[in-house]
Amino acid sequence: ARRDIVVDLINDLCDGNLIILWAAATNRSDLIKDVYERYRRFCQQKGEKPFSYVHFYSNLSYLQSVGLVVLIATKVDRAWTNRVQLTFDASIAESITRLRFE
């Protein structure tokens, strides 16, 4: 039942938020800056206009508020950054993105 709710929630997301989830699901690194770069590249490939970093981060906060991601503060070298962790199976975001953009 939880899987069905997650699938419905992801299906109802706007394209930008879906691409953010896809980038988080398929990126080797879970650091926010790396996920943002993957998100931007995907948008450019598909002819979508990417969010600015500020709007990207705001949309990540929205995704956290609906329970799809968790942002975890992490110290890297001497600076603090966030990691993005999905709260569901990454293959769900990958398959829904593939269906919507191909």
Region annotations inferred by a language model:
Residues 1-38:
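Winged-helix-like regulatory helical subdomains adjacent to P-loop NTPase cores
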Residues 30-102:
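Terminal-proximal interaction/regulatory segments of ATP-powered molecular machines
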